[in-house]
Amino acid sequence: MGTLLTFEPPAPHLRAALLARCGIDVGEAAATRAIRAEIAYYRAHLHTGGDAAGLAALRRASAEAMRPELGIDADADVLTAALLDALRFHAFPEVPGALRELRAAGLRLVVVSNWDVSLHERLAETGLAPLLDGAVASAEAGVAKPAAEIFERGLALAGVRASDAVHVGDSEVEDVAGARAAGLRAVLLSRDGRGDISSLDQLRSYSSLW
């Protein structure tokens, strides 16, 4: 997610959503703990969200993971809706322009992400989908990074060989090591400055790779 997309701090939005939907005012600390619990549950179970039914069940269960931290008796549907209200994704500022520049250079762009089936919806909502040639979500593919198989899915979608591809990601294990093991070249994007690049527009300095 940290390569293309980020999200606004969700705890304040969760508090506002619960207040609006069921009149319950939870504290900031409780909301923060609840979001952490939800994220932990989601990461452990995102592989179950490979279709619409699985995604609905995953969202409901992830919302339920917040309940012990919130200490409230809200309806499950309300809690799930509040969670979805709280998750507000957007692209990092430089990303749309960087993607346009890469496409103008003749490159095919495919997202390979450890995400549920809603990845496609998120890319559309944030305006990135028209700038891409496709996306592979791990929950749909049935395999996650760093496994070679998910990179192979991305290569097939892009219509290129591994030796002709460059993978950019924010995880040394899932992205860099995984991509290299699958035969791709890899660039580590770390927005804290500890990677090869700290923003996607800096990828132009690696143009020799393609």
PLM segments and residue spans:
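Asp-based, Mg2+/Mn2+-dependent phosphohydrolase catalytic module
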Residues: 6, 20, 29, 71-78, ...
